[in-house]
Amino acid sequence: MSRRLRYGVAVTLDGFIAGPNGEYDWIVMDPAIDFAALYKEFDTVIMGRKTYELTTAQGGHGAMPGMEVVVFSRTLRPATYPGVRILNDDPRDVVKALKARQGRDIWLFGGGEMFRSLLAAGVVDTVEVAVMPVLLGNGIPLLPPGATAKLKLADQKTLPASGIVVLSYSILGGAGSAPRVRYVKPAKTRSKKKAAAPPKKKKKKKAR
């Protein structure tokens, strides 16, 4: 099976992936999400300049250990960002070349505009969203106007502690079905020990 381009993102219940100014402080964390297991499903991550700058604004230079990070930008200088590939090429052509190589899946990280462009080009294979129990009322939408696709639900997980609902969809016509949600840790089931029965009282023998 060829590599899949998977769009994975957190989204509010009313369909926004960021606040009006790119804010991400509304994202809810849940200890059941195993990020190390999630990252092992990919060896390449791609994003646009805006998403990259929001990521680096929190510290660091955006490099991810064990992953090839590809950033599409016409203004960033490659020499300034070690460990990251800054490209000015057409993202559609780059994605097609990446998918032709051997390796794990490719993560399309954030960025509604890039998602719309690549979706319209027919190179996105899955849509995997973590729906947060949050209403923003305004912000950057999951999918700007201009692209449509039919989806098929592959898996879903509900995280009771936080109220997050994780949904994994295949895009019909894509390269294979979407994966099951394996990076959510199973709920721990504690076996209840049966209470020990009280010791039976010995009957006293009657004296003759």
Could you say what each language-model-derived stretch is?
Residues 1-208:
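Enzymes that bind and transform nitrogen-containing heteroaromatic metabolites
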